[in-house]
């Protein structure tokens, strides 16, 4: 079968041939439909994130997948089920407490593999196998865009944890600010638009000039575009308003600190970006004082698990059709897979199609 991989010492994905996998007991064989491309894939290709499977000279890419079960094997799945796989798997050392209690998304770095990212091959292949417990059934109507379920699930977890930090008191947020107008930021903005919290004012930070398709989406969602070149995060309260909730998806280290200044009293920020090392000066006293005297919180969040994928299938049904159409700017066949990795100002979200239902 064909697969898309990055090889050691190279910085461009290529198509390779691999044997079609055979499911072991407890696993199903899945025919891949589509696999999304995101910033993590670009980081893995560039060598800035992730790692190769032990003893292998390549890593099959892809962690945002949707497929159809072709061989249920000895599982309770059925042939024809549309499924989305989760990402984390036990490391080479075997299972650990996080996997044993079915919370692999809470495992610290080094205590897991991630398919298509670190230590385990991903889903950019014509077929893949997976244990049943890591496959989430989704409605057949979501098959075409099922590769969006994984990124939606990332925000489902972040919201769950951020909201839990405010659950000890009456918290009635009205403003939310998404930092980052990439595909994850835009998905999150759309999710906040339909969130049960009923946000009255939404904002999204970027650094692009008009005309721009992401700005068009932001404004179509009735949100305000904030250009960070004109209004840095710490100035947002003076120019717009204090924010009850902030979602950071830029990976820009200063945003973690500046978010505290932009939060309203009792507000919470969710940090999802994974930056490189960067040392800079911070008024630690002001930061500490602001957190304490105004009951603010910051929550770090990474990955997601089955319950978040299941919640994502529900959220998916609430997102406007026009939004999904505008968000996905390209679905490319395997023969033209390189186009899915293009990264320009007209590209928002892309996917590679391996087969159809």
From Swiss-Prot:
Pfam families documented for this protein = ADH_N, Glu_dehyd_C
Q: What is the effect of changing residue 216 to K?
A: Does not affect the kinetic parameters but results in a slightly less halotolerant protein
Q: What does this protein need as cofactor? A: Zn(2+)
Q: Where does substrate bind?
A: 40, 49, 114, 150, 303
Q: Which residues bind Zn(2+)?
A: 38, 63-64, 150
Factors inducing expression = Up-regulated by glucose.
Protein EC:
1.1.1.47
What is stated about the way this protein's activity is regulated? Activated by molar concentrations of KCl or NaCl. Inhibited by EDTA in vitro.
Which InterPro entries does the protein's record reference? Answer: ADH-like_N, Glc_1-DH_arc, Glu_dehyd_C, GroES-like_sf, NAD(P)-bd_dom_sf
Task: Please give the Gene3D superfamilies that the UniProt record associates with this protein.
Answer: Medium-chain alcohol dehydrogenases, catalytic domain, NAD(P)-binding Rossmann-like Domain
Recorded catalytic reaction(s): these are: D-glucose + NAD(+) = D-glucono-1,5-lactone + NADH + H(+); D-glucose + NADP(+) = D-glucono-1,5-lactone + NADPH + H(+)
Q: How is the cofactor bound?
A: Binds 2 Zn(2+) ions per subunit. One of the zinc atoms is essential for catalytic activity while the other has a structural function, according to Ref.4. However, the crystal structures show a single zinc ion, the catalytic one.
**A biological process (GO) annotation for this entry?**
non-phosphorylated glucose catabolic process
- Gene Ontology terms, MF aspect: D-glucose binding; glucose 1-dehydrogenase (NAD+) activity; glucose 1-dehydrogenase (NADP+) activity; glucose 1-dehydrogenase [NAD(P)+] activity; identical protein binding; NAD+ binding; NADP+ binding; protein homodimerization activity
Q: Which UniProt keywords apply?
A: Carbohydrate metabolism, Metal-binding, NAD, NADP, Nucleotide-binding, Oxidoreductase, Zinc
Q: Into which family does the record put it?
A: Belongs to the zinc-containing alcohol dehydrogenase family. Glucose 1-dehydrogenase subfamily.
UniProt subunit comment: Homodimer.
The protein's job, in short, is:
Catalyzes the NAD(P)(+)-dependent oxidation of D-glucose to D-gluconate. Displays broad substrate specificity since it is able to catalyze the oxidation of a number of alternative aldose sugars, such as D-xylose, D-galactose, and D-fucose, to the corresponding glyconate. Can utilize both NAD(+) and NADP(+) as electron acceptor, with a preference for NADP(+). Physiologically, seems to be involved in the degradation of glucose through a modified Entner-Doudoroff pathway.
Q: Which PANTHER family match?
A: GLUCOSE 1-DEHYDROGENASE, ZINC-TYPE ALCOHOL DEHYDROGENASE-LIKE PROTEIN C1198.01-RELATED
Protein name (Swiss-Prot/TrEMBL)? Glucose 1-dehydrogenase
| Organism (species) | Haloferax mediterranei (strain ATCC 33500 / DSM 1411 / JCM 8866 / NBRC 14739 / NCIMB 2177 / R-4) (Halobacterium mediterranei)
The taxonomy runs: Archaea, Methanobacteriati, Methanobacteriota, Stenosarchaea group, Halobacteria
What gene is behind this protein? gdh
């Amino acid at each position: 079968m064909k697969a898309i991989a990055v090889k050691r010492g190279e910085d461009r994905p290529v198509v390779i041939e691999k044997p079609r996998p055979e499911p072991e007991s407890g696993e199903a064989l899945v025919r891949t439909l589509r696999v999304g491309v995101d910033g993590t894939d670009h980081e893995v290709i560039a060598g800035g994130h992730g790692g190769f499977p032990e003893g292998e000279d390549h890593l099959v890419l892809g962690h945002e997948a949707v497929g159809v079960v072709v061989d249920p094997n000895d599982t309770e799945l059925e042939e024809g089920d549309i499924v989305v796989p989760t990402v984390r798997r036990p490391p080479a050392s075997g299972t650990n407490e996080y996997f044993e209690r079915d919370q692999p998304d809470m495992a610290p770095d080094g205590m897991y593999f991630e398919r298509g990212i670190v230590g385990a091959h991903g889903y950019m292949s014509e077929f893949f196998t997976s244990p049943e417990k890591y496959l989430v059934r989704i409605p057949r109507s979501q098959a075409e865009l099922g590769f969006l379920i994984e990124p939606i699930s990332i925000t489902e977890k972040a919201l769950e944890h951020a909201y839990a930090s405010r659950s000890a008191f009456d918290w009635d947020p009205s403003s939310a600010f998404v930092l980052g107008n990439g595909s994850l930021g835009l998905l999150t903005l759309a999710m906040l638009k339909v969130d049960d919290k009923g946000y009255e004012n939404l904002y999204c930070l970027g650094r692009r000039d008009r005309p721009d398709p992401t700005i068009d989406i932001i404004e179509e969602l009735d949100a305000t575009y904030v250009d960070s070149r004109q209004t840095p995060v710490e100035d947002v309260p003076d120019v717009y308003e204090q924010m009850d909730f902030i979602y950071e998806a830029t990976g820009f280290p200063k945003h973690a600190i500046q978010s505290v200044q932009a939060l309203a009293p009792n507000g919470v920020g969710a940090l999802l970006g994974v930056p490189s090392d960067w040392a800079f000066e911070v008024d630690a006293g002001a930061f500490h004082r602001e957190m304490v005297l105004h009951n603010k919180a910051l929550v770090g969040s990474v990955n997601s698990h089955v319950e978040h994928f299941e919640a994502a299938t529900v959220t998916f049904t609430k997102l406007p059709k026009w939004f999904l159409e505008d968000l996905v700017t390209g679905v490319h066949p395997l023969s033209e897979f390189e186009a899915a990795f293009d990264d320009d100002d007209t590209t928002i979200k892309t996917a590679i199609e391996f087969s159809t239902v």
